[in-house]
């Protein structure tokens, strides 16, 4: 076992903006746990580390406040402050010189390892090398270009190259290392990089290997992400979701007012396909709440200001990991739910579009005026957030799914009480730099009264104007 481990967490994370606007990047969460806690667990549980040094810099006090002394984590945590984070990782490691006198593992704080085999590195505690680098085999050369490449002879590394332009093999260098204390001299003896003007750790190890140091490669298993950019963080969250998708619970939330003609059929349609159904009923006088209860739904019946208020009420009560929203008028079908959930593996929110003509059933409330009005309004939203390259064709479709953690991220910014709640959700997910995928869904004739929001051209214009006004205000930074 290794007595001491190290996690460098000093970086500013500027490339991860806006996620790092108020949160250090190592405290970003994937699957409900921060990157830092995940890596602390690897050092503690797989490598037997009892004491961990965190090299802090940017927002270091926030990290210290979040992690503490490690007493509640079963490991001792000590902090070393790096006064010049621009000096780079290698120089940051020099802070350890007076604290470490034996081989020690290092895991970079902005990396994610899932189901890894770090425990195999324990053999290097008994058979020490000068350096051990964790590597993975990959067919994705883009990942290698973002990290570093290695050249091997057996398990011995003969050279390393940071962010290579030419890929010579399928070995991806990771931010897991084991160093001997001699690494400190190697760092001090390495000149600054001609590319960056600072001493680069990869160049230190490469130079040392070519001088005859014993530098070994340990092949890591499991899933891995190096998180430097927003797309890396999104990829990491999607990776975690895919690995655990079968374990997630699905909640269906339905706002209702006088939906007695349809609510029973809606619940029957979805009951076997979700884990719970929450109905937020605006004290319907027609017995909607009683029918929903009889069909097994959890019903919240109280005065509600409108569609958006009812949905917020239902979402607050839902316990699922994936929250599915839809109407109680039977205009949507559970047959589309499997494909919505399939796309949730790769998105933070999946929204339906009712503008695919072939999927609009005869008699549905979607004439050319309403359909093309939705398309036009959706394109306005798409244009205003063009940097994120969304693709929208329907601003008002209320059949959608969102991850619970994504909803919690945007919840405090949701205030619309009426139908503008639907585009408001889209806007806030985009503002949070999260991913939305739109897919076509079947749209059927509504059962019950005509919608007061889309039952006439005047109602459509009023509703559309409110939606667009909200979108423009949010784009300009107003609430």
Residue ranges of each PLM-predicted region?
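Conserved beta-loop-beta/alpha segment of the NTase-like Rossmann-fold superfamily
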Residues: 64-152, 321-354
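Acceptor/aglycone-binding surface of glycosyltransferases and processive sugar-polymer synthases
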Residues: 146-155, 303-305, 309-316, 334-419, ...
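Conserved N-terminal catalytic core of the sugar/cofactor nucleotidyltransferase
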Residues: 1-7, 15, 29, 33-107, ...
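Hydrophobic helical membrane-anchoring modules
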Residues: 210-214, 218-250, 269, 342, ...
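Catalytic-core segments of class I nucleotidyltransferases/pyrophosphorylases
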Residues: 123, 153-225, 230-234, 402, ...
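Short, well-formed alpha-helical segments that are part of the catalytic scaffolds
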Residues: 34-43, 256-273
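N-terminal nucleotide-binding beta1-loop-alpha1 segment
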Residues: 1-21, 241-254
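Conserved core of the sugar-phosphate nucleotidyltransferase
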Residues: 114-195, 355, 371-380, 398
């Amino acid at each position: 076992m290794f007595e001491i481990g190290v996690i460098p967490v000093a970086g500013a994370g500027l490339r991860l903006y806006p996620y790092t606007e108020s949160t250090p990047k190592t405290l970003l969460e994937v699957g409900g746990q921060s990157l830092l806690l995940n890596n602390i667990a690897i050092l503690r549980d797989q490598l037997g580390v009892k004491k961990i040094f965190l090299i802090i810099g940017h927002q270091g006090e926030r990290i210290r406040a979040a992690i503490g002394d490690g007493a509640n984590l079963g490991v001792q945590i000590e902090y070393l402050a790096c006064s010049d984070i621009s000096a780079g990782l290698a120089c940051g490691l020099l802070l350890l010189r007076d604290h470490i006198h034996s081989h020690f593992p290092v895991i970079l704080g902005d990396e994610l390892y899932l189901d890894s085999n770090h425990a195999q590195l324990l053999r290097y505690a008994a058979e020490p090398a000068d350096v051990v680098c964790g590597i993975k085999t990959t067919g994705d050369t883009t990942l290698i270009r973002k990290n570093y490449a290695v050249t091997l002879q057996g398990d011995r590394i003969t050279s390393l190259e940071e962010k290579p332009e030419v890929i010579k093999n399928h070995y991806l260098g990771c931010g897991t290392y084991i160093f001997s204390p001699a690494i400190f001299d190697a760092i001090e003896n390495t000149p600054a990089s001609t590319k960056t003007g600072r001493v680069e750790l990869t160049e230190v190890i490469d130079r040392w290997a070519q001088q005859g140091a014993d530098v070994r490669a340990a092949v890591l298993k499991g899933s891995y992400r190096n998180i430097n950019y927003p797309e890396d963080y999104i990829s990491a969250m999607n990776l975690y979701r895919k690995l655990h998708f079968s374990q997630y619970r699905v909640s269906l939330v339905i706002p209702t007012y006088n939906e007695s003609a349809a609510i029973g059929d809606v619940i029957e349609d979805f009951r076997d396909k979700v884990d719970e159904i929450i109905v937020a009923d605006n004290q319907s006088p027609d017995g909607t709440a009683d029918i929903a209860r009889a069909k097994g739904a959890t019903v919240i019946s109280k005065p509600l200001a409108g569609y958006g208020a009812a949905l917020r009420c239902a979402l607050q009560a839902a316990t699922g990991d994936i929250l599915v929203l839809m109407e109680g008028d039977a205009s949507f079908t559970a047959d589309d739910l499997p494909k919505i959930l399939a796309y949730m593996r790769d998105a933070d929110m999946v929204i339906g579009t009712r503008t695919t003509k072939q999927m609009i059933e005869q008699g549905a409330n979607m004439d050319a005026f309403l359909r093309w009005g939705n398309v036009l309004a959706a394109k306005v939203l798409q244009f205003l957030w063009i940097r994120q390259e969304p693709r929208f064709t329907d601003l008002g479709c209320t059949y959608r799914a969102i991850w619970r953690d994504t909803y919690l991220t945007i919840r405090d910014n949701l205030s619309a009480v009426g139908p503008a709640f639907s585009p408001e959700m889209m806007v806030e997910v985009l503002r949070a730099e999260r991913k939305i995928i739109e897919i076509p869904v079947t749209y059927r004739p509504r059962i019950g009264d005509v919608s007061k929001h889309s039952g006439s051209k005047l109602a459509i214009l009023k509703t559309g104007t409110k939606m667009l006004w909200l979108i423009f205000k949010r784009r300009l930074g107003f609430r």
